[in-house]
Amino acid sequence: QSAGMQSILWDIDRIGQLTREIMETVAKQNKGKHKYSKEALKELKKAMEQIQMIYGSCIRAISGDVDMDIKELMRQKEDIMQLDEKMRKNHIARVGKGKCDSKLTIPFNDVLHNIDRIGNSCVNLVEVAKENVTMQAFFAED
């Protein structure tokens, strides 16, 4: 139980760190000389909304929702990976058309990588929950 609880806490903390990195990267780029295009921001918003849904599902799982379907979560994670690939291609196309600055390619890819890593941590959380390790252990009575 304690190793599972430690894993839950580590992944939740990691998700928080990655989310902060995403927010800082996007904010920094939008305050600087080079800004993301409206299309790029729209795609990033969509990716964050998808990861938010996955995160909500994994929180329900570690809160004791035994009906959480790990296969469905993996499908959602796969959807994010496909969106990631599409967003990278779209960014390169926008750079080619002059809609996005090539100097934003590395920060944009960093954001996408962090979104993928959040998805990985969400999958980890559900896998731990499937082993009957949940946050309910914090509230166990003596």
What are these regions (language model features)?
Residues 1-142:
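Cytosolic, long alpha-helical scaffolding segments
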